[in-house]
Amino acid sequence: MPAEIAAIERLLRGGKSSVRRGKVWDQICAETGVGQVVGKEIHFTPEERQRLREYAKAEHGLDPQYDSRAGGRMAMASHNASEKLSPDSVFGELLVLATAGTAHLRVSGENVTTPQGSVLSVRSDCLDAEHFKTQNLVIVENGGLMPYWADIMLPDVFTDSIILYRGHRENVRGVTELVSNQPADKLAWFFDFDPSGQSLALDQGKGSTLVPARWRELGKHTPFNQPKVHRNQSVALKRLKDRADGDLLAIAEHMASEELAVMQEHMVRRNILLSALPLA
């Protein structure tokens, strides 16, 4: 197993948010554009930990967080005397969703919508999977945005959508299954508007990425741009340029010239209208 995968695995399975700096971790951070150096340590946000997981899966075909005991305490109780041996959190297996516009969920045979400011947490086996595929689906990377889903300025084609948090622990499995069955024309991803975020969007290989509709107007002068974050993503920028084409390649080149890195939170807080770019 490559040293990078082993290092990411130890971080994720150990539930850690920081590591000591070293050659391996410096390489990982240069490649992915995540992590904040604090003295002799590198600190990661929950979203960055999820990016590390996706990086490992995309680059090496391995899930560094896989654990055969996954499934929660109820599942563990069926074959072990101590249900507390499960590494899962109490609510970690629940999917976190919201419904925008006229979209709705079918949960345990009932139609469900979410009022503004609220979200729904549900077991994946309670969802009507066939109905789910008929709805538009927007995957949000930053879970902190979920209570503010109504403020996301979705493009017209995704105005009526189920909004689903991408997850960061056990619920990632349920999200992955839903995404695998979702029609590409009914799927969109909302990541940071920076090299790392859009490279991660390309890794998905399906659906569309949501970007600012007027991205050409964003630049070094933009007050909520984070050029320092952009400069830490040189390897991710190269990966994006090497793989992107069309509008996404033009975006990558614009990011490079303007040192652009705009977080999802700022796009939502400032009511920036989004546009959908197909990934394939």
Predicted regions, residues:
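Nucleic-acid enzyme cleavage-core boundary/entry regions
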Residues: 1-184, 196, 202-280
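Terminal interaction module
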Residues: 187-192
